[in-house]
Amino acid sequence: MIDEKDKSYLEEKVKQASNILPQKIVEDLKNLISNKEVLVTRDEIDKIFDLAIKEYSEGLIAPGEAIGIVAAQSVGEPGTQMTLRTFHFAGIRELNVTLGLPRLIEIVDAKKVPSTPMMTIYLTDEYKHDKEKALEVARKLEYTKIENVVSSTSIDIASMSIILQLDNEMLKDKGVTVDDVKKAINRLKLGEFVIDESEGNTLNISFANIDSIAALFKLRDKILNTKIKGIKGIKRAIVQKKGDEYIILTDGSNLSGVLSVKGVDIAKVETNNIREIEEVFGIEAAREIIIREISKVLAEQGLDVDMRHILLVADVMTRTGVVRQIGRHGVTGEKNSVLARAAFEVTVKHLLDAAARGDVEEFKGVVENIIIGHPIKLGTGMVELTMRPILR
């Protein structure tokens, strides 16, 4: 905190620092000084801002630094030390999660669907402290088809009917009743049919106008693949205790579908599917998740990479307003230089296409100048000097 008489002095320092420091840092410093429990004097305000400016200035790159190459090296080199395995998730046998190098490759390749899509779903206050209520939400999320609750099926050729033997344990586990199964079948357009229920949860589905066994088998497959409840893409939903609350971990991801389920805290839903984040929340959120996912992958492997390198990778991937991969179909493939594109991948194709189009190489970048042995415009090469032999 500060004296009332020093408030105007703090505002003046904030105004001066705004010309040097980023706005976010200035605001954080102001809040820190204003909300500190002990009294902060004018001298201390000066020291805080001077130290912040000094640290910030030392953290800036030198003009002409090849930041792209440094970032590529700083993220890529630790990647060679990563493991190549898919791990079980936090002691849960049913869920696998891709970590290490395969996950890093997925992120920078901007894959539409990760190899192990998953979500971490937080619940609202009404649901997060009650396990039964959390299980209720999990059952709403888990995509359940009729085949998931059937122990066996058979076909009675004499009566042209399909017999489904329902599994009592699976019905209980999935939170599904026999009536739910009947309703799902009745929603199908199968022509004229009657469902008879017998003891032991056995359903006998008789058809009036079916005279072919092949047609009966097709109908059976259609019935087994019929949705009873849940959200498409969510194969499993498992309730886990985290601290003093229950959360739901899912095998599979469907962000837009999950947000519409009652009991889900929409402000805290997480998914490892970057494309879904982009579609639902936009490019800024996608950039944030790229940063978070790369940082998480590196941290899990015990690798320490400066955050600025990761930020640069995320910025390059999202700078056009859509998520692009770092590869020949994305960032690298869109370079203006013919030689730079050819140096990366499929060399002959790039050269032939460029020749057919009549492209001109302007030698403005780094790669193309190195290829032909020209000095590059980086570091001291950025400075152009003209010598005057006689100076009067």
From Swiss-Prot:
Which of UniProt's keywords are assigned here? Answer: Cytoplasm, DNA-binding, DNA-directed RNA polymerase, Nucleotidyltransferase, Transcription, Transferase
Q: Which InterPro entries match?
A: DNA-dir_RpoC_beta_prime, RNA_pol_Rpb1_5, RPO1C
Please provide the Gene Ontology terms (biological process) for this protein. Answer: DNA-templated transcription
Q: Which GO terms describe its cellular component?
A: cytoplasm; DNA-directed RNA polymerase complex
UniProt catalytic activity: RNA(n) + a ribonucleoside 5'-triphosphate = RNA(n+1) + diphosphate
The answer to keyword DNA repair applying to this record is: no
What this protein is reported to do is described as: DNA-dependent RNA polymerase (RNAP) catalyzes the transcription of DNA into RNA using the four ribonucleoside triphosphates as substrates. Forms part of the jaw domain.
Q: Which family does it belong to?
A: Belongs to the RNA polymerase beta' chain family.
- Specify the protein name: DNA-directed RNA polymerase subunit Rpo1C
Q: Which organism is it from?
A: Saccharolobus shibatae (strain ATCC 51178 / DSM 5389 / JCM 8931 / NBRC 15437 / B12) (Sulfolobus shibatae)
